[in-house]
Amino acid sequence: MRRFGFSGTALICLAGFAVLSLSGQDDKVVRGKYLVEEVARCQDCHTPKMDNGSFIKSQWMKGAAIGVTPAAPVQGWRPAAPDITPAGAVWKRWGDDGMTTFLETGKSPRGGKAGAPMPAYMLKRDDAEAIVAFLKSLQ
C-alpha cells in the first residue's frame, strides 16, 4: 500500500508539472482561437461552407472559394482563400516564422502583399504568435 501511495503521489506531481509547463502554450492557443474565430473571423474566407451557409467543420481553415466577386475590378483579387493550416502549401513554404511575420507586417516572407480581399494585418507580435499557435493546433 505504501508503494502505491508513493507512486500515486509521484504521478500526480509529474502530471502537475506537465500541466504547468503546457499552460502557457495552452493559454496562447486559446487566445489565438479567440483572435482567429471571434475577432478576425478567418473562417469566413478560409473554411468552405455547405449550401445552407454553415461551415464544413472537417475542413476548418483548409481554404475555400471566396464566393463573391467585386462589382468593379480589384487589383490582386483572389477568388479563393488558401489553406492556412500547417498541412497547407502556404505554411509549408513560409513556416511558423513566415506566418508570424505575415501577420505582423502584412507581407509575405518575400515581401509580397496578400491578394484582396485579405486585409494586410499588422498585429502585435504576441497576437501573431497566438494565432500561429492556434493554427498549429489544427493539425
What spans do the regions from the language model cover?
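N-terminal secretory signal peptides that target proteins for export/translocation
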Residues: 1-4
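Electron-transfer interface patches adjacent to heme c in soluble/periplasmic c-type cytochromes
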Residues: 40, 61-98, 119-128
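Electrostatic cytochrome c docking/interface patches
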Residues: 19-38, 50-55
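Surface-exposed aromatic
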Residues: 113-119
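Glycine-rich, acidic and aromatic/proline-enriched surface loops and short helix-turn segments
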Residues: 105-109
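Bacterial N-terminal signal peptides
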Residues: 8-18
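Ligand-binding pocket scaffold of soluble enzyme catalytic domains
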Residues: 96, 110, 134-138
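The canonical Cys-X-X-Cys-His
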Residues: 32, 39-49, 131, 135
